[in-house]
Amino acid sequence: MARVKRGVTAHAKHKKVYKAAEGFRGRRKNTIRAAKAAVDKAQQYAYVGRKLKKRNFRALWIQRINAAVRPFGLTYSRFINGLAKSGVVIDRKVLSDLAIHEPAAFQAIAEKAKAALAA
């Protein structure tokens, strides 16, 4: 049976790990065992971070909407309830963006929600 030398494949695998560990400090960037562990952990953090990002942005949008509806005498929850009753279907991301960049349009939406709550 022929002898299999794995130097080429091992080098390619290591090169891939070192590329991913670029920018790491200390042994984590140039020792394969430490680099592999560091890259694995970095990928775990990245995975969790992608999930947290969605929660954080939704929370930010809600805070912005809440701050924007307070001058109209509403709270966030009453505002959302008013939107549902009036049949307005706009997501929180767009509402937040409107509150910042188009205050007049947001005010019209807030007044519509307030009217739906009163009725």
Curated annotation (Swiss-Prot):
Family according to the record: Belongs to the bacterial ribosomal protein bL20 family.
* CDD domains the UniProt entry points to: Ribosomal_L20
Q: Which GO terms describe its molecular function?
A: rRNA binding; structural constituent of ribosome
Q: Mind listing the UniProt keywords for this protein, alphabetically?
A: Ribonucleoprotein, Ribosomal protein, RNA-binding, rRNA-binding
> From which source organism is this entry?
Afipia carboxidovorans (strain ATCC 49405 / DSM 1227 / KCTC 32145 / OM5)
Is Ribosomal protein one of the keywords? yes
* Function noted in UniProt: Binds directly to 23S ribosomal RNA and is necessary for the in vitro assembly process of the 50S ribosomal subunit. It is not involved in the protein synthesizing functions of that subunit.
Q: Which GO terms describe its biological process?
A: ribosomal large subunit assembly; translation
The lineage's top-level taxon is Bacteria
Q: What is the lineage of its organism?
A: Bacteria, Pseudomonadati, Pseudomonadota, Alphaproteobacteria, Hyphomicrobiales
User: Record's Pfam families?
Assistant: Ribosomal_L20
- What InterPro entries does the entry give? Ribosomal_bL20, RIBOSOMAL_L20_CS, Ribosomal_protein_bL20_C
**The protein's name in its UniProt record:** Large ribosomal subunit protein bL20
- GO cellular-component term (any): ribosome
